[in-house]
Amino acid sequence: MATETESTPNVAMSGSPPQVSFLQAFWFWLKLGFISFGGPAGQIAIMHEELVVRRRWISEKRFLHALNYCMVLPGPEAQQLAIYIGWLLHKTRGGLVAGTLFVLPSLFILIALSWVYIAFGEVPLIAGIFYGIKPAVTAIVVHAAHRIGSRALKNNVLWAIAAASFVAIFALNVPFPFIVLGAAAVGFLGGRLAPEIFKVGGGHGGADKSFGAALVDDHTPTPEHALFKWWRLIQVAVVGAFLWAVPMACLVLKFGWDHTFTQMSWFFTKAALLTFGGAYAVLPYVYQGAVDQFGWATATQMIDGLALGETTPGPLIMVVAFVGFIGGYVKAVLGPESLFLAGAVAASLVTWFTFLPSFMFILAGGPLVESTHNDLKFTAP
C-alpha cells in the first residue's frame, strides 16, 4: 500500500488519475497534519500543490470554489477546506477523517510542548529548536501568497478588488467580515453584469495553465452524497447539536457551571463562532477571556503560546490548546497529583469545542455550495 500511495503524486498530465481509495486519502491527511506549517496560506498552498497539481484529486476551479466558501466561515479555513475535499471524495467519513487528522498531530505536539513549558520552564530551548523552522515558514507563506495571487487575480478588475481589500483591512481597519461580504457582493453583481471579467476560468497567460483531468473535475457531476437534501441538513444540525450539548451537559452535571472545564468549553464555543479573519482576529477576545476574565494564563504565557502555535503544524488557532493546558494545569482542577492529566483534558476539551463548528459548517453547507459550482454568480471571486 505504501508503494501505491507514493505513486499517486506522479500522475502523468495525460489521462485521468486513478481512483483514490479511502486508505490512500487517510495516509495523505495524516501526512498533511504533520507538515501543515505556515498558517492558512502555507497550508492552502500545500493542499493546492498536492491535491490540484501533483495528485489531481480535484480541479483548480473546484478547489477555489470550495476555498471561497471556507473563507467566509468562522474558523480555520485551511482545516475546513480539508474537511470539504475529504467529504467530496469519500462522503462524511472522508470529511471527518480529513478534518480530524489536520488537527490531531498539532494537539498532541502542543500538549507535549505545553507540559515541558509549564513543568520545566525551558522556553529558550524550545524556541531554539524551532528557530530554524521560522525562515522556512516565512518562505512558505510568501510563496503561497504569490501562488494564490497569481492564479486568482487574473485581470485588472480583480487586482483592484484585492488592492481595495488590502487598504481596507490594513489602513482603515475595516472588520474582515465586512471586507469578505463586500467582495462577495462585487463578485455576485460582476458575475451578472460582466461575466467575461469575473469568470473563474478566464484570464491570460500562466493563470490558464491546466494540470490535466482531475478526479473531481470542472464539469464532474455532483456526487449523490453531495446533493442538497433538506433531511440531510436537518440530520447534520441535530447530530451537531447533540455532539455539543451532551459533553457540555456532562461537564455541568459532573463539575458544575463555574468549574474551569465547563467555563472553558462555553468560552471557546463562543470564540469558535467569532474567528472571522483567522486566528489573529480572535486572539484579542481569547486574551481578554483567558488572561483578564478567568486567569487561565498570564500575558507572557499567551505570547509564548502564540510562538509555539506559529512554529508547530496545524491551524494557528490551536494556540487555544496551549491556553487550555496551562489553565487546567495551573488551576489543578483534578488535584495536585494529576496536573498533566488536568492540562491534557482541558486542552482536548478546548480543541473539541473550538473545531466542532467547522465540521458542522462544511457537512451542512457543503451540498448547498456544490449546487452552485457551475453558477457564475457564486464562483466569481
Residue ranges and their predicted role:
Residues M1-L73, Y84-T312, L316-A380:
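Multi-pass membrane proteins that catalyze or facilitate reactions on polyprenyl-/lipid-phosphate substrates
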Residues Q80:
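GIY-YIG nuclease signature motif recognition
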